[in-house]
Amino acid sequence: MSLEVNVTKRFDGFTLHAAFTAGDTATALLGASGCGKSMTLRCIAGIVRPDEGRIVLDGRVLFDRAQGIDLPPQQRNVGLLFQNYALFPNMTVEQNILCALKKEKDPAARRAACAEALRAMRLEELAKRLPGALSGGQQQRAALARILAAKPRILMLDEPFSALDSYLREEVEGEVGSLLAGFAGTALLVTHNRDEAYRLCREMIVMDSGEVLRAGTTKEVFANPRTRAAARLTGCKNILPCTRVGEHTVHLAGWEQPLTVALPVPEGCRAVGIRAHDFAPCAPGTPNSLPVQAVSTSENPFDWNMIFTLPGGETRLWWKVSKETLAAPPPKAPACLAAAPENIMPLV
């Protein structure tokens, strides 16, 4: 199963150009609010018509502007979970699911498919309840049951945890993770949360300002985001201006000692990224080290966040260290931090 998307949609002051492919695995669309992630899902679902381009699912053309093809949503066999779940408020959970099975003309087959969806989402005891009588997590399961009952060829989840209280998210995330892992087809997860994307999806597409910045396996994208914007969106706080010296060497602005980089440094490299947990205290003069001055320390439940400045005082560095490694902040903060070559990411 495969999805091919190459579409353009223009609005006043904003243009979406989404071009990517996705296979039969869970793929995250990661980006800040307003970057075009949700609009991309709506184009795929047929809710929004692109101005240009083409969408193909398993060799079947869903949209092709040049050929005049634009299948209506009900013919695309696409399941889209909206942020607010879009359950019919005056219908029970069971009735909501049966609405998705209108194409099935055999009443017995409809009832059987509905019962299967209720069992799959553990909703048997809630079948006769209205959506307003359900918790946020139960409403989400009901919406997913309605989608899955129709057996879509692609499952799309638009910020599925945004409407949930924080204490529910971990439980619901586990359920969604199991669903994505067991879904036999293409699944797209829209999120602005890099941790959710990393935990739930094997593939990742990073979007910014209507454009795809980076695509690949989730681990590849985190290890080598390639651009400063993609690095920030994947959570890298330390993005340091530099100049390219050689294929594996850069100079940081205002610091004479070169840094060795394991990844090839592209010609257009203008910065390096170092994730906060990839620093380690070191002695002055250690290769790939930076002299630092402590600014502040803050405590989280399981780790410490320390902020330093580089010489000159304008550039800040974030260092995150687990409490298993460091039970308490040292009386004297380290004067030097180092990063291994494999943990330095060249960025354009």
What is each stretch, according to the model?
Residues V5-A26, L30-A32, S38-M39, G46-R49, ...:
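Non-catalytic connector elements of ABC transporters
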Residues S38-L41, R141-A142:
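ABC ATPase nucleotide-binding domain helices that frame the ATP-binding cleft
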Residues R42-C43, E203:
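The short alpha-helix immediately C-terminal to the Walker A/P-loop
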Residues I47, V78, F82-F88, N193:
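Catalytic "switch" loops of ABC-type ATPases
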Residues V48-R49, V56, K102, A181:
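A position-specific signal in ABC ATPase nucleotide-binding domains
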Residues R54-R76:
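ABC ATPase NBD Q-loop/coupling interface
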Residues N77, T92-A229:
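ABC ATPase nucleotide-binding domains
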Residues A223-G246, G273:
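C-terminal boundary and immediately downstream tail of ABC-type ATPase nucleotide-binding domains
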